[in-house]
């Protein structure tokens, strides 16, 4: 049976494990209508447009 030759230190284990749980950055695009930041392929919550089409009215 395979056995490790030396014990892996706690810092090496945590360093390796940290890459699994690394948070990734969320991609952000700009709304072509109002210029506000929004998630890609989603309706802009600031103005209610998806691309050039008005999807819903925004109550202000």
Curated annotation (Swiss-Prot):
GO terms for cellular component: large ribosomal subunit. Keywords: Ribonucleoprotein, Ribosomal protein. Signal peptide: none annotated. Pfam families: Ribosomal_L32p. InterPro entries: Ribosomal_bL32 (IPR002677), Ribosomal_bL32_bact (IPR044957), Ribosomal_zn-bd (IPR011332). Belongs to the bacterial ribosomal protein bL32 family. HAMAP family: Ribosomal_bL32. This is Large ribosomal subunit protein bL32. The gene is rpmF.
